[in-house]
Amino acid sequence: MEGLSLLQLPRDKFRKSSFFVWVIILFQKAFSMPLGVVTNSTLEVTEIDQLVCKDHLASTDQLKSVGLNLEGSGVSTDIPSATKRWGFRSGVPPQVVSYEAGEWAENCYNLEIKKPDGSECLPPPPDGVRGFPRCRYVHKAQGTGPCPGDYAFHKDGAFFLYDRLASTVIYRGVNFAEGVIAFLILAKPKETFLQSPPIREAANYTENTSSYYATSYLEYEIENFGAQHSTTLFKINNNTFVLLDRPHTPQFLFQLNDTIQLHQQLSNTTGKLIWTLDANINADIGEWAFWENKKISPNNYVEKSCLSKLYRSTRQKTMMRHRRELQREESPTGPPGSIRTWFQRIPLGWFHCTYQKGKQHCRLRIRQKVEE
């Protein structure tokens, strides 16, 4: 009881304190002054509503876009698994959105695919689209396929990340990583936060040896690209290949290349020599150099937010990232028509809000239709 008495106020001071509390509450209602500041990562949906949806986000200058690689979701990054996540579709225009900062990717891809008649499957990159700048391994694949559609999209609705530009489609001959775009909400706009590199910066940042970040290239040939059943060959040289039929790490392919070269198992003719992997060979050597999400909250957010029209909330979970080795997993596949369209819900129209006669008025800077 003595401890509780410390929390009690004398009657006269209680009246004065309650008066000031009511003054603060009324002042906040009148001037929309936020009483709290978001300082941690344990946000509830209602807190996001209070900060973003009730007059506290005055301008999109407070939003900073960041590209997050799908490697953070623990997806298989080998070429046979990755290509199953991509599919062709017609009648859907490509969309591009810029982002200001990103992660260093462990695995990037570069595709040069032709149709049986010799025409190109993938469109050339538009002006200003450059390859993803930070790649530890670049998987360069050439080949042929039916390519049944105008563009190659991501079946799970993710973006293809280029140099500070994210597109919904794959461009020919340009390094890209798989990822999504997230928005950071800043308490106040800061000019120096996440500044973009200079426009004149070199396109291939990995050429700078002082960065201690070397890019290694792995080459492949793909047959029947874009179809349900395709064949992927790892290229040792122009006439020697290895058939890839299971998930594997980049380190395994480098060791495989060294083994074939060391034991002189290369093709000694002008014909194509294709090796197959023994069933007992472990293709998981080395480290699966990406993250795996461990779910610490079994339930999804069930409370609806005013942001639900912009982002899907059905798959959001509280997650914690930590490093570990991943076991082999089956890559989810789906029919070409199962492309999810939540990536088209990202707001591409910038807005700015002002106060007039005590009320907030918002207007779009650039009007752009967002498809549902």
Curated annotation (Swiss-Prot):
The disulfide bridges present are: C108-C135, C121-C147
- Entry GO MF terms: channel activity
Q: Which residues are glycosylated?
A: N40, N204, N208, N238, N257, N268
Provide the site residues for: Cleavage.
R324, E325
Kindly give the Pfam families that the UniProt entry links to this protein: Filo_glycop (PF01611)
What are the start and end residues of every segment in region (Disordered)?
320-340
One annotated Gene Ontology cellular component of this protein: host cell membrane
Q: Which terms under GO biological process does the entry name?
A: monoatomic ion transmembrane transport
Q: Which residues form the signal peptide?
A: 1-32
Keyword annotations: Cleavage on pair of basic residues, Disulfide bond, Glycoprotein, Ion channel, Ion transport, Secreted, Signal, Transport, Viral ion channel
Key word Ion transport present in the record? yes
This protein's record includes keyword Iron: no
Record-stated family:
Belongs to the filoviruses glycoprotein family.
Its protein name is Pre-small/secreted glycoprotein
